[in-house]
Swiss-Prot record:
It comes from Campylobacter concisus (strain 13826). This is ATP phosphoribosyltransferase. The keyword Nucleotide-binding applies. Its EC number is 2.4.2.17. Its main location: cytoplasm. The gene is hisG. Keywords: Amino-acid biosynthesis, ATP-binding, Cytoplasm, Glycosyltransferase, Histidine biosynthesis, Nucleotide-binding, Transferase. CDD domains: PBP2_HisGs (cd13595). It is an enzyme of class 2 (transferase). Pathway: Amino-acid biosynthesis; L-histidine biosynthesis; L-histidine from 5-phospho-alpha-D-ribose 1-diphosphate: step 1/9. GO terms for cellular component: cytoplasm.
Amino acid sequence: MITVALPKGRIAEDTLEIFRKIFGSSFMFEDRKLILEEGNFRFLMVRNQDIPTYVTEGAADIGVVGLDVLEEHKPNVVRLLDLQIGKCKVCIGIKNEEELDFSRSELKIATKMPNITRNYFAKLAVGVKIIKLYGSIELAPLVGLSDAIVDVVETGSTMKQNGLKVAGDIMQSSAYLIANKNSFIIKKDEILELYQKIKDEISK
């Protein structure tokens, strides 16, 4: 049996749809259940940020997680495949009437992705003070907590609704299939067979 960690939300639904097309089974989580067993698979419904931990620690053989999460945490996993779902961007956001002043000695940036943020601004030789937040990132510049934010953006509508604009793109992201390193040795044939089936399905 292969254990698969999925992030709650649309990416989980899109991933299960790929499995439905490949295997012809229902692959539906019952209401509020966090574990689904179907055929040779056991699916775990997990918070997006926790997927690398489940896979790294071996609680799941494989997982589906955003590239932004992989780049932020750099987990010791095997990156197998870009699933071409959950596409988004990591962007800099600022207030509509402002521009980002890179000449300042230090910019205050609110984000839940401190590593991506720090690395990006380091390449620009811009000093930053990271304000680590876990939600409602858009609020920070509106109340003077930060000069700008770094956040995941799909359509940009949340920023617009809160009087912010995109001031720059840091990276593109989409959902990746990853594997635990030990599982990739012990269950290599099963995982590679699944990898090939998924690759064939998403390239149709």
